[in-house]
Amino acid sequence: MFGVSMRTLISPSLAPFSLHLHKPSLFSTALRFSFSINNITPTNSPPSTISTRKLQTKATRVTSSSSSQPLSSSSPGEIHVVVGPMFSGKTTTLLRRILAERETGKRIAIIKSNKDTRYCTESIVTHDGEKYPCWSLPDLSSFKERFGFDDYENRLDVIGIDEAQFFGDLYEFCREAADKEGKTVIVAGLDGDFMRRRFGSVLDLIPIADTVTKLTSRCEVCGKRALFTMRKTEEKETELIGGAEVYMPVCRSHYVCGQNVLETARAVLDSSNNHSVVASSL
């Protein structure tokens, strides 16, 4: 894992948890939040397998403040990075921060990778069912054109990026937005994959970030602090979209033990498959 001597956005140790709750997302150490936001319910409701509680928002994909004056880009912006394993509350934290910025009168937009199709394509959705409209894009370089160059330059203050590990142009986009265009960029994504290797270019943002927050979850086995994501299935590709049916948050001890169990099970399965192939060829 990496260490950073930077102030964090939230304190993971304050999050509630209960070992008796079934959903891994409720083990998250991210702070829960509640906003009183009125009048529009975003479309594309999450499926019934998640909570039906939704954020009521005034925004569609972009929220404008009462002022429509062009922005001044004379001063640099900021970059804030939120990382952690699955079910640690990264999207929840991103959404809380973005809505807090909106409450101060900032104009906001949220982007997520179009690879994330778990709940709905036109909104970011937390594991608890809270949602907010967003731009679902294959890359970040197309955002300015889709959003509108003039609107991007003059009527946008804060950009949220969810599932950031899937964007290959993440570093370049964030650096330019903050350094040259005066935007505040809040990024949420996985720092490591199921093999505990770096995932995408999220970690590349640390040297240019104003703050970095490392969230943790709760181990699905023992309830201790979970830093890692374990894959339950046999697939070995890095990018495999899934939720609790595919992944679980685990502590270091159960990651190591679990990996040994999974590797043994896979070896037995491979051996059984090989014997079946040999027998069928006789």
UniProtKB/Swiss-Prot annotation:
UniProt-annotated stretches for the region Disordered: 45-76
Positions with biased composition (Low complexity): 64-76
Catalytic residues (positions): 163 (proton acceptor)
InterPro entries listed in its UniProt record: P-loop_NTPase, Thymidine_kinase, Thymidine_kinase_CS
Keyword field contains Methyltransferase: no
Pathway(s): Purine metabolism; Pyrimidine metabolism
Enzyme's top EC category: transferase
Chain sites annotated for binding ATP: 84-91, 116-118, 162-165
CC terms in the record's Gene Ontology section: chloroplast
GO MF annotation: an example: ATP binding
Function: Part of the salvage pathway for purine and pyrimidine deoxyribonucleotide synthesis. Phosphorylates preferentially purines over pyrimidines.
Sequence similarity: Belongs to the thymidine kinase family.
Name of the protein described by the UniProt record: Thymidine kinase b
Taxon lineage: Eukaryota, Viridiplantae, Streptophyta, Embryophyta, Tracheophyta
